[in-house]
Amino acid sequence: MSLKTRYRETIRPKLLKDLGLKNVHQVPKVQKVTLNRGLGEAATNSKALEASLKEMATISGQKALVTRAKKAIATFKIRQGMPIGCSVTLRGDRMYAFLERFINLALPRIRDFRGVSPKSFDGRGNYTIGVKEQLIFPEITFDKVDTIRGMDITIVTSASSDEQGKALLSEMGMPFRKK
């Protein structure tokens, strides 16, 4: 059973009861997942940017967008409009497919993994996790990687509080660390 159907059939009714909500539309749901990678070396090394774009597309199943510098920063040798990273925004079926792969396949492959931190919520029910290396994803092969790079993964939910967001993600199978 896919994560999307599991959400509709089991998670949503359970959250409706557990959170004491009156309407099905009040139940928190995942709106989008954003993968972001900042590349400091992209200003000087264009091959790093190309490799990163290819990796992000492989991981997400969607073409990555090049993020560019808004301002020139002389100390970092960056001019306005220079490529400095890449990001992917996932919605709909691709989002649920990525979340399922991330929770069930990628997270357990992290070295010394004891669960994700329950403190990474932003106060509005959105969760951000930093991944130190891209090799945890099964789509990435070790031979094709030139350097190990991390990324930020933000899960944006419609939850109004951190408690609702945590309840939603833990029902989806996110392994939170016990305090």
Curated annotation (Swiss-Prot):
GO biological process: translation
One GO term describing the cellular component: ribosome
Alphabetical keyword list: Ribonucleoprotein, Ribosomal protein, RNA-binding, rRNA-binding, tRNA-binding
Keyword Transcription found: no
SUBUNIT field: Part of the 50S ribosomal subunit; part of the 5S rRNA/L5/L18/L25 subcomplex. Contacts the 5S rRNA and the P site tRNA. Forms a bridge to the 30S subunit in the 70S ribosome.
Annotated family: Belongs to the universal ribosomal protein uL5 family.
Stored HAMAP family: Ribosomal_uL5_B
The name this protein goes by in its record: Large ribosomal subunit protein uL5
Protein species of origin: Prochlorococcus marinus (strain NATL1A)
Lineage per the UniProt record: Bacteria, Bacillati, Cyanobacteriota, Cyanophyceae, Synechococcales
Gene this chain is encoded by: rplE
